[in-house]
């Protein structure tokens, strides 16, 4: 955590605590996603997420690990899964360039081994985006749908190779 953010941390924990009972009543699980230091100053690593969910201390509050952010913040992608273990509810798969899995430089073998080590059998989400100057703009031109379809097919093939 890049700065003294005790007040932000407390505010976040208190807010999630206040939402946890509503989540329980509606059979919903809230997930805390560590984001890289360029996008968040509160929860950046698996260790941060573990501390956060333990402070909230509610069965409806778990963690989400995102390979894109892990690639920036985690020294050991496998260890991040071991750190959070039973708290991991969702995994976002995204390569370093947000293109199809395998087109960037993330070593997914460490991610897969970490997931298998904890017996992860929950939700996996694929996150890709078509190349272009604005990463936050979904429509990148007339070939966007075609590119995204290609990324999805390539990425699904990788996921099947790793998990099936």
Residue ranges and their predicted role:
Residues 43, 47-65, 71-164:
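Histidine-acidic metal/acid-base catalytic patches
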Residues 1-62, 72-74, 146-151:
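Active-site acidic/histidine proton-transfer and metal-coordination neighborhood
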């Amino acid at each position: 955590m890049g700065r003294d953010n005790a007040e932000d941390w407390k505010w976040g924990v208190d807010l999630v605590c206040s939402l946890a009972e509503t989540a329980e009543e509606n059979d919903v699980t809230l997930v805390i996603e560590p984001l890289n230091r360029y996008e968040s100053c509160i929860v950046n690593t698996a260790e941060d997420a573990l501390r956060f969910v333990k402070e909230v201390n509610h069965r409806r509050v778990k963690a989400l690990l995102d390979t894109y952010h892990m690639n920036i913040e985690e020294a050991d992608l496998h260890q991040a899964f071991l750190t959070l273990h039973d708290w991991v509810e969702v995994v976002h798969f995204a390569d370093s360039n947000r293109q199809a899995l395998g087109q960037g430089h993330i070593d997914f073998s460490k991610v897969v081994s970490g997931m298998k080590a904890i017996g992860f059998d929950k939700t996996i989400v694929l996150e890709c985006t078509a190349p272009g100057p604005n990463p936050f703009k979904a429509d990148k031109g007339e070939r966007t749908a075609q590119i995204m379809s290609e990324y999805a097919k390539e990425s699904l093939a990788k996921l099947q190779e790793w998990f099936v």
